[in-house]
Amino acid sequence: MANKSMETIVSLAKHRGFVFPGSEIYGGLANTWDYGPLGVELKNNIKKAWWQKFVQESEHNVGIDAAILMNPKAWVASGHVGNFNDPMIDCKSCKARHRADKIIEDAALAKGDEIIVDGMTFDQMKETMIKYDVVCPDCGKADFTDIRQFNLMFKTFQGVTESSTNEIFLRPETAQGIFVNFKNVQRSMRKRTPFGIAQIGKSFRNEITPGNFTFRTREFEQMELEFFCKPGEDLEWHSYWKEFCKNWLLNLGMKEDSMRLRDHEDDELSHYSNATTDIEFKFPFGWGELWGIADRTDYDLKQHMEHSGEDFTYIDPVSNDRYIPYCIEPSLGADRVTLAFLCDAYDEEELEGDDKRTVLRFHPAIAPFKAAVLPLSKKLSDEATDVWAELRKAFPVDFDESQSIGKRYRRQDEIGTPFCITYDFDSKEDGQVTVRHRDSMTQERMPISEVKAYIEKHLQF
């Protein structure tokens, strides 16, 4: 059984070049992480896989790349200026600051109850804190300030002067850049409902208590789709995207027992939402939200219509029906899902003779390296390099000629490389190489000319 503690995952991520602490030579900056050579490949592969299925292969959806900085009126319209808050509480004893909802949920979970605090009033939170004997996670005391709201948006200034007239925000989500461009995209691409607009981009939230490695950070990347449909068809499309998102994860190798779908109860739903479902992943630290699929009705388009004066009424070219489209929003965190795939892939396997190996069982489509070329001897490096150079034109391939072949296999297993290609002394004569499979460790001999197509076949999902 693999020891899937966060300490183990973080140690491997740092050691093997997946993720490094941000600004490490200056003592770091709390809650910032830099993706290393393998981490950036893994994350980019996941983003490419999302774009492939949600945009490239979709008959409905197109993409956009909206600016991070928006007219601040957009954030007033969306409700973020007035309502984008988390409940904050301070410990009077040690001065630590916490998200009230999270310490309540953690205290309840410690006593065997899984509760949802979202939707509770401050008074209800206080009562729940008493019920579960909530104490400060840092010092163990139960001496707290009153709960209050904390706005999560980062403020900055545009231009050379710092005044309220120049105040702007780093976007806390990518979605609003899609909504304000609804008419631009619909007209320019001649789209008819149902259709969607997808975007991948950075967002920023001044989280009260970030943590759990890359799970909750103040700077993060989102992969969001806003899917517009006719009112009355929204719940059907919500069900469709819920299953589509789940199957995307499964097709990329995520284990079904590592995830669960949780439909929000009525008292959890936003006032404008008809339905919301979270896809949660079982991280080593517990269940955490991975993907939110929300039926946002026509709330966002109506808000921007009201505040901008722009008419987002859609006119059906066949029926002449006029309506404000409803919107289904599957919103996925790129950093969270990258961490989830890393945790899910991690395994420790016992082998014969008290030997064991650490292996990352990534689907080949998202593995950082698709293959590694390993010359059996350094005397064969020139010929093996030619094979490596040819394969690199098609996909990322590693090259390793140091230490024994067994140790090189173990290194590639530990970074999730699905195939190792061994070039031996017979290869010069027969033009064949040995291909080793990461998961089964089985080997097969094949012509060098067939290796590229063989690997590409396994990249499909």
UniProtKB/Swiss-Prot annotation:
Family from the record: Belongs to the class-II aminoacyl-tRNA synthetase family.
Location (main, coarse): cytoplasm
E.C. designation(s): 6.1.1.14
Gene3D superfamilies assigned to the protein according to its UniProt record, in alphabetical order: Anticodon-binding domain (3.40.50.800), Bira Bifunctional Protein, Domain 2 (3.30.930.10)
One GO term of the biological process aspect: glycyl-tRNA aminoacylation
Record field: catalytic activity: tRNA(Gly) + glycine + ATP = glycyl-tRNA(Gly) + AMP + diphosphate
Cellular component annotations (GO), alphabetically ordered: cytoplasm
Gene: glyQS
Official protein name in the record: Glycine--tRNA ligase
Residues at which ATP binds: 205-207, 215-220, 289-290, 333-336
Native source organism of the sequence: Lysinibacillus sphaericus (strain C3-41)
